[in-house]
Amino acid sequence: MAVIKMTDLDLKGKRVLLREDLNVPLKEGRITSDKRIRAALPSIRMAMEAGARVLIVSHLGRPVEGEFDEAFSLAPVAAHLSRELGRDVRLVKDYIDGVDVAEGDCVLCENVRFLKGEKKNTEELGRRLAALCDIFVMDAFGAAHRAQASTHAVARFAPVACAGPLLAAELDALERALDAPKHPLVGIIGGSKVSTKLTLLDNLSHRVDRLIVGGGIANNFIKAAGYEVGKSLYEPELVEEAARLMAAARAAGGEIPVPLDVVVGPELADGAPATVRKVSEVGPDEMILDIGPATATRYREILLAAGTIVWNGPVGAFEWEQFGAGTRALCEAVADSPAFSIAGGGDTVAAVEKYGVASRVGYISTGGGAFLEFLEGKELPAVAILQERAAQS
C-alpha cells in the first residue's frame, strides 16, 4: 500500500505526533488488559530511540466531547507506560497550544476526545493538532476506520503524514491475505447474526475458495440447506440471503460448507447438557451452540490444505466449556496449518489466547471494527488520507 512509513524518515530532533490506540478496558481505574499498550510500545520506543520529541495521542472510551471527565482520563495509561518504558511519562492535560519535549523523550497527551471537534473531524482541530508536530504518525489501526480529527484531519495538515510500524504491519498482513493470497484462500466468519456481517460475507463469498461460517450465522445457512434449527438463533428474513450467498460462492468456484453435525443444548447456560446431533436431527426444543466433531474434522482438513486463512469470529459459544470444542479444534487447525493466517476481532483474539495458539497464528490484528471494514472491502479513511499525502509528496 502506497503510504510513507515512519521507518523511512529521519526523526532526530523532530516533533512527532504519534496517534496510538490506547483505548484499554478499565475497571475502577485499573487497566484490565494492557494488550493495546503492549502493541504500541515498539513504535513508541522506536521513535524515542531515533531521537524524536514524541507526543503520544489516543482516545479512551466515549466521554462527552469537549469536556474533561476523570473517569476517561489516560492517567492509568501514563502510569502503565512509565513502568513499561522505565521512565516517567508525563500526562499533559493542556497540550493543544504546544508542549516542550526533549529529544528521545515522550509525553502522553490527555484523552483526545476531551477536545471539541475530535469526533466531527473538524478542520480547525485538525490544523491545531498538525501545528504540534513536524511529523504526524498514524499508528492506530484500531481507529483507522474512523474519520476523526486525530486520525484524519490532522493528516491533511501536518507537514508530513506517515504510517507507524504497527499500522504498516497491519496493512501488509491484510494485503498479503486479501490482495495477493496464496490459494486456496479460506475465510472463517463466525458471530451471532448474519445481518451484522452481511457485507463481509458478500465480499468474501466472491473472493475466497472456501468460506466456513460458524456461530449463529451458520444457522441461517443450515436452514437455507433445508435443515431444521430448533430454537437456535437465526434470522428468518435472511435465510434466502444465505441461499444466495451459497449459490454465489458455487458460481465463483468456491463453497460455503454446511456443518455435518452440531452440538445442541436446551439453553445457553452453565451446566446445560451438550449433545452431538447430525445436522438433520436437531430437535424442535434444541439450540445449536457449536459444531460437532465430524464437522470439526472436515474443517481441519480444509484449513490444513489452505494457502491463506482469514478469520473473524468463533464457531460456537466457547465461553461455555461444553460448547467450546469446535472453536478449540478450529484454533488448533489454524495453528497447525502451513497457511499464512490472520485473525481479528475481540472474540477471535480471546479464543486464540484461551486455547494457547496465539504464537502460532500468522498475524493477530489489533483492530476490531477496522479489521472488519477492511475485510468488507471498505476504504479506511485514516489510511486513505495517508495514501493521498504520499501521492502528493
Curated annotation (Swiss-Prot):
Subunit structure: Monomer.
Gene3D superfamilies in the cross-refs: Phosphoglycerate kinase, N-terminal domain
Family indicated by similarity: Belongs to the phosphoglycerate kinase family.
GO cellular component terms, semicolon-separated: cytosol
An annotated GO BP: glycolytic process
Entry's Gene Ontology molecular function annotations: ADP binding; ATP binding; phosphoglycerate kinase activity
Pfam families on file: PGK
Pathway: Carbohydrate degradation; glycolysis; pyruvate from D-glyceraldehyde 3-phosphate: step 2/5
Ligand binding (substrate): 21-23, 36, 59-62, 113, 146
This protein's record includes keyword Ribonucleoprotein: no
InterPro entries in the cross-refs: Phosphoglycerate_kinase, Phosphoglycerate_kinase_CS, Phosphoglycerate_kinase_N, Phosphoglycerate_kinase_sf
Binding annotation for ATP: 197, 319, 345-348
EC number(s) reported in the record: 2.7.2.3
Tagged with keyword Nucleotide-binding: yes
Protein name, as recorded: Phosphoglycerate kinase
Subcellular location: Cytoplasm
Keyword vocabulary terms for this entry: ATP-binding, Cytoplasm, Glycolysis, Kinase, Nucleotide-binding, Transferase
Catalytic activity: (2R)-3-phosphoglycerate + ATP = (2R)-3-phospho-glyceroyl phosphate + ADP
Source organism of this protein record: Nitratidesulfovibrio vulgaris (strain ATCC 29579 / DSM 644 / CCUG 34227 / NCIMB 8303 / VKM B-1760 / Hildenborough) (Desulfovibrio vulgaris)
Main EC class the enzyme belongs to: transferase
Chief subcellular location: cytoplasm
Highest taxon above the source species: Bacteria
